[in-house]
Amino acid sequence: MQSGILTLDLHGKNTHQTKVAVDALLRKAGNGTYRIRLIHGYHGGTALRDFLQSEYGHHPNVKRFLTSPDGGTTELILREYV
């Protein structure tokens, strides 16, 4: 973990594998975690990015999400860093 950020590489995973991995990381995230960075890439299409936004956009532990300018990373914001 890097200063409150957990990172997960999702390359090669399907939506089911992605859900299992992200749910586990959300359970693991402690009080010191304020952001989960999910690296899904963009050359293989937008299926994982779209899934993450749909599945976790209204998750009770996720305040909001950010997509990187290139579309290859989604960050789940669990709490604002102050």
Where are these regions (language model features)?
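Long, charged, low-complexity intrinsically disordered regions
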Residues: 1-82
